[in-house]
Amino acid sequence: THCISSAASDVYKRQRMDTANSKQSDLDKRYIRMASIWSENSYCQRRKVGALIVKDKMIISDGYNGTPSGFENVCEDDNNVTKPYVLHAEANAITKIARSNNSSDGATMYVTASPCIECAKLIIQAGIKRVVYSEHYRLEDGIELLKRAGIEVVFVDTSEK
């Protein structure tokens, strides 16, 4: 009987893990949709990116790509090239945390585009432990750096419901 109860226990544990994974997957999709909606606040014409930082199922920060505070809300120059001082969504979300009483240590970042290498460095230093994204950036070096740092990286396909 011990083998049967042990096997039943294993099945029960797997079912609980599947349920937990399914719930996490549903949450990931919802937060990514919210980050996508948040990206609509960006004044950038070429690409709109949104980011949320979530800890204990609470959004503790948000950001979208754009110019620094006090600058004109124009991201591209006359040749449609992104100005060098435009901040990425991840950087905006992380710097908001720095100006608040919150901590991003152990949090999850939801970002509509996979992070570039510069943002990956900020994510690592901010103590974020998980990154969920929904669009591939042309370069994968940011994702590789996050993985090297032991950060869980998850791609969510928003085309499937």
Which residues are covered by each model-predicted region?
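Single conserved hydrophobic/aromatic residue that forms the stacking wall/gate
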Residues: 1-15
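Acidic active-site catalytic centers that drive phospho-/nucleotidyl reactions
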Residues: 10, 28, 50, 90
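Short beta-strand scaffold segments in enzyme catalytic cores
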Residues: 48-62
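Short, basic/aromatic recognition patches
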Residues: 23-47
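Long alpha-helical scaffolds
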Residues: 7-8, 51, 98
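Zn2+-dependent cytidine deaminase-like catalytic core
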Residues: 18-26, 33, 60-160
